[in-house]
């Protein structure tokens, strides 16, 4: 079984006029691939639990992105499109998607 495991988290404050850019989704922007796996493995998050479960099952994993921003204004359209496309691009051949 091949699982796509990803994290996208943002609390939107619609009253804020300032858009949330891609760079806000992590210390230096989102984590990708092996970095996303390393950051989330063992973390007290749903993505961390999904990774633990996948490893216990012996499942193959794809971790295209881990993106978490602090509460802020509406997500910039280009940032949203990039995050979504990163997940979509990793999906072919996967049996299931676990999204945190």
Where in this protein do the model-derived segments appear?
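Glycine-centered loop/turn motif at secondary-structure junctions
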Residues: 57-58, 95
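A short alpha-helix capping/helix-coil boundary motif
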Residues: 28-30, 67, 99
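Aromatic-enriched hydrophobic runs in primary sequence
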Residues: 27, 59-60, 91
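Short beta-strand elements in bilobed, periplasmic/extracellular small-molecule ligand-binding domains
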Residues: 58-66
């Amino acid at each position: 079984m091949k699982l796509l495991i990803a994290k996208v988290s943002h609390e939107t404050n619609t009253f804020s006029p300032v858009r949330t850019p891609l760079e806000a989704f992590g210390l230096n922007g989102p984590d990708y691939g092996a970095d996303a796996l390393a950051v989330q493995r063992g973390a007290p998050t749903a993505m961390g639990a999904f990774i633990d479960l996948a490893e216990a099952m012996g499942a193959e994993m794809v971790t295209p992105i881990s993106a978490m921003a602090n509460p802020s204004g509406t997500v910039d359209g280009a940032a949203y499109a990039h995050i979504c496309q990163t997940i979509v691009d990793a999906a072919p051949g996967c049996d299931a998607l676990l999204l945190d």
